[in-house]
């Protein structure tokens, strides 16, 4: 049976993501490159996905670009869509009962309300680096943990620690101060999460 292959590319400010679907249902290949718009990241992400799947660009029935740098792929993409709409559709694809999506990007944080794969409302924080992916990258580096482990570690917190600064530089100083006082990293991480959410 012949499959219909499609490619989705999300070009963010700090990362490039690509995914290939078969028949709009099955994830065939995916890639995440830690550099985004204006770099080789988007092309590398596409190349990785095509290589993983053993396919060529010409075998793709449709290519969609989204994200901060979506306009940079006009020659490759058949269409462009806002990342908000893509988040709603993608989250519903993975988790059909989803109602809330939180996107912590390199430049901003977006919280979406989703109903049946459609975004019905959203709020966004785009002031400096407060609460963004870059903020969390810096905090993870200072704490010497992987950014992907922050959620699990923060959930193990047993004591409330306040990180009051929303500025990345000042929050980094607060975290270093907490570490020097012997505060448990898990409690600091929980404080960071609460700071991002406020």
Task: Cite the ranges covered by each PLM segment.
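Short glycine-rich, Thr/Ser-proximal phosphate-binding strand/loop in the N-terminal lobe
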Residues: 3-44, 48, 126
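Short glycine-aspartate micro-motif
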Residues: 4-10, 62, 99-102
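A short acidic Gly-Thr/Ser loop motif
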Residues: 10-14, 68, 104-108
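Short beta-strand-loop/turn "lid" adjacent to the catalytic site in phosphate-handling enzymes
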Residues: 32-35, 53-85, 113, 120-121
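Glycine-rich phosphate-binding loop plus the immediately following alpha-helix
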Residues: 38, 116-159
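Internal, active-site/partner-interface "lid" segment
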Residues: 146-178
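Adenine-nucleotide phosphate-binding core of ATP-dependent small-molecule kinases
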Residues: 173-198
């Amino acid at each position: 049976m012949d499959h219909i292959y499609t490619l989705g590319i999300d070009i963010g400010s700090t990362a490039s993501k690509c995914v290939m679907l078969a028949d709009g249902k099955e994830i065939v290949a995916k890639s995440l490159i830690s550099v985004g718009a204006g770099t080789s990241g988007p092309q590398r992400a596409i190349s990785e996905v095509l290589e993983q799947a053993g396919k060529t660009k010409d075998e793709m029935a449709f290519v969609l670009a989204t994200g901060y740098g979506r306009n940079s792929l006009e020659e490759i993409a058949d269409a462009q869509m806002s990342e908000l709409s893509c988040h709603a559709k993608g989250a519903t694809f993975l988790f059909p009962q989803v109602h809330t999506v939180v996107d912590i990007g390199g430049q901003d944080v977006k919280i979406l309300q989703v109903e049946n794969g459609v975004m019905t409302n959203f709020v966004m924080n785009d002031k400096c680096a407060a609460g963004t992916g870059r903020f969390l990258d810096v905090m993870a580096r200072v704490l010497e943990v992987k950014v992907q482990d922050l959620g699990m570690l923060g959930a193990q917190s047993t004591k409330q620690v306040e990180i009051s600064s929303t500025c990345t530089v000042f929050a980094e100083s607060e975290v270093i101060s907490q570490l020097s006082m012997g505060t448990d990293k898990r409690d600091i991480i929980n404080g960071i999460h609460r700071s991002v959410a406020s």
